[in-house]
Amino acid sequence: MQIILLEKVLNVGNLGDIVKVKDGYARNFLIPNKKARRATKEAIAEFEVRRAELEKVAAEKLSAAQAQGEKLSGMTVQIAQKAGVDGRLFGSVTNADIAAALGKQGFEVEKAQVRLPEGPLKMVGDHPVHVSLHTDVTVDVTVSVLGEHV
């Protein structure tokens, strides 16, 4: 399906690009999330009229993400979980737990923005985690998992 992108989409294209993607990806994700529209003549003409407005909104989102990224970069988040004597957790620390801990510290982060390169954290200690605030803004946060011995 031919679509016109209304914002930058990772691994697809930038604002204003007309790209061909799988029908399901367009119908189920891009179009409902207002990231794209079908590339009809009317939609392309309407986009060209609104291009400056959309570019301004995209620049505002990027600058807001960069500002939040500067505050968040290099930060350490502490999460306490029950653990055995060998340092292994009963359960694990997931991206939802990390997003909730960041929320308590005043940062609005969705769980989908937290990237765990090796999956959920299952050991006590410090772990590097990537937080993707925008397609162009990714910061590293250290998650310190503290063990509560049972």
Curated annotation (Swiss-Prot):
Function according to Swiss-Prot or TrEMBL: Binds to the 23S rRNA.
GN (gene name): rplI
GO terms (BP aspect): translation
SUPFAM superfamilies documented for this protein: L9 N-domain-like, Ribosomal protein L9 C-domain
Domain of life, per lineage: Bacteria
PROSITE patterns associated with the record: RIBOSOMAL_L9 (PS00651)
Residue ranges of the TM segments: none
Gene3D superfamilies: Ribosomal protein L9, C-terminal domain, Ribosomal protein L9, N-terminal domain
Keyword field contains Ribosomal protein: yes
GO MF entries: rRNA binding; structural constituent of ribosome
InterPro entries per the UniProt record, alphabetical: Ribosomal_bL9, Ribosomal_bL9/RNase_H1_N, Ribosomal_bL9_bac/chp, Ribosomal_bL9_C, Ribosomal_bL9_C_sf, Ribosomal_bL9_N, Ribosomal_bL9_N_sf
Keywords assigned by UniProt, alphabetized: Ribonucleoprotein, Ribosomal protein, RNA-binding, rRNA-binding
Pfam family, one: Ribosomal_L9_C
GO cellular component: ribonucleoprotein complex; ribosome
Similarity comment: Belongs to the bacterial ribosomal protein bL9 family.
Ribonucleoprotein found in the keyword field: yes
Name of the featured protein: Large ribosomal subunit protein bL9
Native species: Paraburkholderia phymatum (strain DSM 17167 / CIP 108236 / LMG 21445 / STM815)
